[in-house]
UniProtKB/Swiss-Prot annotation:
NCBIfam families: metK. It holds the Pfam family S-AdoMet_synt_C. It comes from Streptococcus pneumoniae serotype 2 (strain D39 / NCTC 7466). ATP binds at H16, D175, A176, K177, R242, F243, D251, R257, K258, A274, K278. This is S-adenosylmethionine synthase. Catalyzes the formation of S-adenosylmethionine (AdoMet) from methionine and ATP. The overall synthetic reaction is composed of two sequential steps, AdoMet formation and the subsequent tripolyphosphate hydrolysis which occurs prior to release of AdoMet from the enzyme. The keyword Transferase applies. Its cofactor is Mg(2+); K(+). GO terms for cellular component: cytoplasm.
């Protein structure tokens, strides 16, 4: 008898409180990098009814109007109506940013490898901004080489935002969540969607019947291929019956609380570090991107159907302390060969990653909602498949 299993992932919209915080943090990062590409930034944000607090550590000579960046970001998301309890022009903005600790800066600005070494490699100059472990993942379930549950979850909330911003569904408000359960067969291949959960904020006059029908017809059926839906697929749409109060009025939000949404929906392991508000010297962010870059190129090269890459670092040290690749029995070559090839082809020192992926640019605000990985709507360097041939050659 064949054994089938279920796996579930979720996503949240750009109007979710935690995602508002992520987007503000990354908008501040982008604004600083646009003026000072060498800046070190760790910007955290907290949002709640009528108030935004921005705090953290920054080293830069650039001036950025934090108040304006915060308000513009909130307006772009769609919080422009005071009835929402959180509005771009009326919210209180409270910045509290200080300079990066000199104890941390000395290890980032001069890595262990170059201290007292006159013949230094410029890419050894930057040490990791902290210790930690980071994961990257890819699987051949979708065109973008992402797990199907998180890919569909992201597309559902993005579709809701499109319908809200275009005015096609006029009663929608910015806050929303999605969740998709996919059934896998005995070969670990997705065969159908078992359950879809969507909760979307709405104006008080919208009826449950109207919301239910619109979400099924204009969101679910537009996003999920019909081949994955059948008469046993379950839909739970606004299952509480009412979702008028939402966003920061309904729940406080913090930067870095949606790290599973940001990555692989729980399908792969996670090192625990968040991304938003951090410049690329923070390996929580840059090494996670590098690990995805490696994993995606491995799968695209046909060297595995599924690949997970772990990188680990010591603070103030440029070279990773470990590189581990797991192909879960799907690899066509030994994992040790892939690890050796990855070290040869991908420069995994922080400065090497920054150069390889061109990470000093203001590109981060666009990643802070709807996932950092598997994006086909924007051009992200860690999603490129330009190392496929090099990997194939390296493992011959």
């Amino acid at each position: 008898m064949s054994e089938r299993k279920l796996f579930t992932s979720e996503s949240v919209s750009e109007g979710h409180p935690d995602k508002i915080a992520d987007q503000i943090s990354d908008a501040i990062l982008d604004a600083i990098l646009a003026k000072d590409p060498e800046a070190h930034v760790a910007a955290e944000t907290a949002v709640y009814t009528g108030s935004v607090h921005v705090f953290g550590e920054i080293s830069t000579n650039a001036y950025v109007d934090i108040n304006r960046v915060v308000r513009d970001t909130i307006a772009e998301i769609g919080y422009t109506n005071t009835e929402y309890g959180f509005s771009a022009e009326t919210v209180g903005v409270h910045p509290s940013l200080v300079e990066q600790s000199p104890d941390i800066a000395q290890g980032v600005n001069e890595a262990l490898e170059v201290r007292g070494n006159a013949d230094q490699d410029p890419l050894d100059l930057i040490g990791a901004g902290d210790q930690g472990l980071m994961f990257g993942f890819a699987v051949d379930e979708t065109e973008e080489l992402m797990p199907l549950p998180i890919a569909l979850s992201h597309k559902l909330v993005r579709r809701l935002a499109e319908l809200r911003k275009s005015g096609e569904i006029s009663y929608l408000r910015p806050d929303a969540k999605s969740q998709v359960t996919v059934e896998y067969d005995e070969n670990d291949r997705p065969v159908r969607v078992d359950t879809v959960v969507i909760s979307t904020q709405h104006d008080p006059e919208a009826t449950n019947e109207q919301i239910h029908q619109d979400v099924i017809d204009k969101v679910i059926k537009e996003v999920i291929p019909s081949s994955y839906l059948d008469d046993k697929t379950k839909f739970f749409i606004n299952p509480t019956g009412r979702f008028v109060i939402g966003g920061p009025q309904g729940d406080s939000g913090l930067t870095g609380r949606k790290i599973i949404v940001d990555t692989y929906g729980g399908y792969s392991r996670h090192g625990g570090g968040a991304f938003s508000g951090k410049d690329a010297t923070k390996v929580d962010r840059s090494a996670s991107y590098a690990a995805r870059y490696i994993a995606k190129n491995i799968v695209a090269a046909g060297l595995a159907k599924k690949a997970e890459v772990q990188l680990a670092y010591a603070i103030g040290v440029a070279q990773p302390v470990s590189v581990r690749i797991d192909t879960f029995g799907t690899g066509t070559v030994a994992e040790s060969q892939l690890e050796k090839a990855a070290r040869q082809i991908f420069d995994l020192r922080p400065a090497g990653i920054i150069q390889m992926l061109d990470l000093k640019r203001p590109i981060y605000r666009q990643t802070s909602a709807y996932g950092h990985m598997g994006r086909t709507d924007i051009d992200l360097p860690w999603e490129r498949l330009d190392k496929v041939d090099a990997l194939k050659e390296a493992v011959k």
